[in-house]
Amino acid sequence: MKIISNILLTLSLILAGLAHAETPEKKMITVGAQWKIGPSTAYWIVAKEKGFFENLGFEVNIVGIMGSQANLSALQSGQVDLASPQAFTLAKARAEGFKAKMIMCYVPKPQLGVVYHRGRGIKSPLDLEGKTLGIVAGSGEALLLPMFAKVNGVSVEKIKVTQLSYGVLNGMFFEGKLDAMTTFMPYLPRFLSDGHKVAAFQYEDYGIYFNGITGTEKFLKENPITVRRFVRATQKAFDWIYENQKEAVDIFYKVQPELISDDHQADYDQFKLVMSTQYDDISRKKGVGWMNDSKWKKTFKFTEDNFDSKINFSTSDIYTNEFLRQ
């Protein structure tokens, strides 16, 4: 009996130890979305409303943050535990000494492109030569323009590029003062719904990463269970959303009815464009969020070419797949 009692005691201690080992380190985490909460970030709201973040052992608070640099600033200041910067913005910050890693890239392809007026002789990208194109200097869509031009045999020097602010760009375009503009592609269905006679060229996958869940090295090291549970729940959520896009849109607008447009089909089309960039060749094989060295090295080159940054670190210093489903 004494032997059995000792065995049972040992087993209970082992089980207790295992249970303790799997206890999340945090009671709540705050996660920054890459933009304000709206159609382009609807999947975060849907994931929460659908229950993917329940039973994790901690609360998940999603906040909208306007842009990549603001995401990094919030992460650096501790306003959020995890953020969603663009990969090249993160690489620039890492080159400047900020130690953080991307742990799930959920935008591995650009959500950007060129929108143009129909009836102005633009049928292919080559027709942009000689036309007036509005851009916001330093924006992702502007930085990718040379790649888009090169792939399509277009000379950027032959395009009449006009640099404007976001506050002015759309107005000038829809007033007809510009032939085309670089923009966030999911806006296109809304433009069409509003009656604008426009079309677009969407940027292709140029081999660089965009937005992804990112944490400081310190936070990732101190909270591995919390991070792993959140990331894997997010993977499951994104997979479900991708397969159930109409239901996902309905869930989002039930929570945010003030954002619904008069043309609900445009809402569906907008979300479809957002979700079309969630998977690349790597993530289709391995799962949403997965990254590899090759694409990160191209992201490094893009960063050096556009941000006057010197990449003095390895790919293992800026990303990891360890928290993803294996």
Region spans (language model):
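Bacterial N-terminal signal peptides
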Residues: 6-16
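Sec/Tat signal peptide C-region and signal peptidase I cleavage site
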Residues: 17-21
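Short, glycine-/small- and polar/acidic-enriched structural segments
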Residues: 23-175, 179-185, 196-201, 207
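Periplasmic-binding protein-like
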Residues: 106-116, 192-223, 227, 231, ...
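Phosphate/pyrophosphate-binding betaalpha-module
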Residues: 189
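Secondary-structure end/capping motifs
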Residues: 222-306
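Conserved C-terminal helix/tail region of periplasmic/extracytoplasmic solute-binding proteins
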Residues: 293-326
